[in-house]
Swiss-Prot record:
UniProt protein name: Mannitol-1-phosphate 5-dehydrogenase
Function: Catalyzes the NAD(H)-dependent interconversion of D-fructose 6-phosphate and D-mannitol 1-phosphate in the mannitol metabolic pathway.
Binding sites annotated in the UniProt record for NAD(+): A5, I6, Q7, F8, G9, G10, G11, N12, I13, G14, R15, G16
Domain of life: Eukaryota
InterPro entries: 6-PGluconate_DH-like_C_sf, 6PGD_dom2, Mannitol_1_phos_5_DH, Mannitol_DH, Mannitol_DH_C, Mannitol_DH_N, NAD(P)-bd_dom_sf
PANTHER family xref list: ALTRONATE OXIDOREDUCTASE-RELATED (PTHR30524:SF0), MANNITOL-1-PHOSPHATE 5-DEHYDROGENASE (PTHR30524)
Cellular component aspect of the GO annotation: cytosol
Disulfide topology: none
Subunit comment: Monomer.
Amino acid sequence: MGKKAIQFGGGNIGRGFVAEFLHEAGYEVVFVDVMDKIIDALTSNPSYQVTEVSDEGERTKTITNYSAINSKTHESEVVQEIATADVVTCAVGPNILKFIAPVIAKGIDARTASKPLAVIACENAIGATDTLHGFIKQNTDESRLSTMGERAQFANSAIDRIVPNQPAGEGLNVRIEKFYEWVVEKTPFGSVGHPDIPAIHWVDHLEPYIERKLFTVNTGHATTAYYGYQRGKKMIAEALADPEIRQIVHQVLEETASLIVAKHEISEEEQKEYVNTIISRISNPYLEDNVERVGRAPLRKLSRKERFIGPAAQLAEKGMKYDALLGSVEMALRFQNVPGDEESVELAKILNEMSADDATAKLTGLEKSHPLYQPVQNVVAKVQKGGK
């Protein structure tokens, strides 16, 4: 029997990051999605191409040995596949984890294999696999919870690879940044051992990697997008070519760097090098990435553990500087009524209908007693008044 992986989410990250490396590791990949269009395309095409883009040029890989199932219409087939798989991964967005948990719970419960299933959520969120695990437990019979560890092991991961807007008419093919980082904690697998996926960097402690990535790549990328959007820039590379925006992004990342260095065993020099690499990556004009794609979903990006409030709250607790991050928060709050982005419409509604206090609590999840609450509330009030 060959190795088999179930990948929830047949979108660009699912096809162009996760499945690429599962395929290279020798896994048969079963895509699970609820979008008929994606399932039909995967079912009717025996291969697709992943093109890695860098300033050195392009490199194309062909992905084969996959199938696809619509979990909306063929749930029992998905359950059966999970029951006989080695690995389950997902790239569906943190808000969708609760919707995929019931079918994964059924699949885990149906397992009789001697080796536990490895479950790895590949989302831009801290502790995404823990979150998924929680939803799976809610969908599992209580009498089966104590033995779940025999059937499945859950490991958090940090993923980092930029997938820009795709050219029209490319179908399943994905253009993607050459650089990638996929870090997964190995401790949950214990004596059983982790799956054999060479692209993964297995570590004992994941938090430094997740925070470094989220508070550098995601914070920097989104800051560029929101400032760029306000200044009429179309592309991320174009925004970063503006010396003023580039300077602001550096200031924001100096603040998050001070947190990362203070908290984790990462030296100032190492973090500085990492920041420079990140800025050079997101400046890459070959990626042709636009500010609206990177800025979309501002409600999620403004939430408590995310890329702005997450580091700013920790800095405030430590009595450290977070002024530049407040600027990013302000620009994110101004990302309203953007065509095709429901969250930006909802954001405008919240800021229009709620008091500054209520809007701050709802958007950021900060408690009134938190040292960051009042500074953020001031920014919310300023945006509500239309001040620049």
